């Protein structure tokens, strides 16, 4: 499954995911997270 995080704010945000880390998202940018089948414990 893919989860897409979209920054709809007018400012930069720094979303994070566990496990994995985080990224910088400027306004309008997207971050696609590919979740392996069977993932049961994750947080964004």
From Swiss-Prot:
InterPro entries: Osmotin/thaumatin-like_sf (IPR037176), Thaumatin (IPR001938). This is Antifungal protein R. The keyword GTP-binding does not apply. It comes from Hordeum vulgare (Barley). The lineage of its organism: Eukaryota, Viridiplantae, Streptophyta, Embryophyta, Tracheophyta. Has antifungal activity. Inhibits the growth of Trichoderma viridae and Candida albicans. Coiled coil: none annotated. Belongs to the thaumatin family. GO terms for biological process: defense response to fungus; killing of cells of another organism. Keywords: Antimicrobial, Fungicide, Plant defense.
């Amino acid at each position: 499954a893919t989860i897409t995080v979209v920054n709809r704010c007018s400012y930069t945000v720094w979303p994070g995911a566990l496990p994995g880390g985080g990224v910088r998202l400027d306004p309008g940018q997207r971050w696609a997270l590919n979740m392996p089948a069977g993932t049961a414990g994750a947080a964004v």
